[in-house]
Amino acid sequence: MDSFVNISIELLKGFCENLKLFSLTLLFSVPAGLLVMFCSISKFKPLKWLSKTFVWIIRGTPLMLQLFVVLYVPGLLFNTPIKVRFTAALIAFVINYACYFSEIYRGGIESVPVGQTEAGQVLGMTKSQIFFRVTLLQVIKRILAPMGNEVMTLIKDTSLANVIANKEIIMMAKEYSAKGLIWPLFSTALFFLVFVGAMTLLFNWLEKKLSYFR
């Protein structure tokens, strides 16, 4: 019988895999979301509608399905399979969350009154000056809450990587439960609760720091 300490260490190693997926997804999907957003508001209509269609497809299909597509389709169509399961999971997560973040960005930008942009133009400011000096900080304040919600969802969604055999904490807990041990499942819940709680405190602090925009 595995000892409590040994199992806890193994679960911690599994959760580190979740944290790695979470961190890298944020690192790549936040700027990728900006790129998708700029495409979706582009005045070049083919690019705009291509971007909107792509976002619609990604947001309208389950992340679990997207994981399978990323893992298997390259090998089936191009004979170039993705051999590392973590890499496949990361690609699927980045694509998925970039699309969700792009919609949050777009909503934040569109919520800033047009009059402020027009006032900047009257003052002779360039588009980039208007964006960085007038729009950006207001957008950050407006999108902070929905971004926080997506980040919380991402933390929990990392557990979906186990469906393509990426060995994270949920997969390990299931392996131990198959041996008749139920407590690793509750320990897994505790890992997620602590991390989500920490991120909640962080976003609450950020919202208070930006409350002067109210």
Indicate residue ranges for each PLM-predicted region.
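Transmembrane alpha-helices and adjacent helix-loop boundaries
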Residues: 1-214
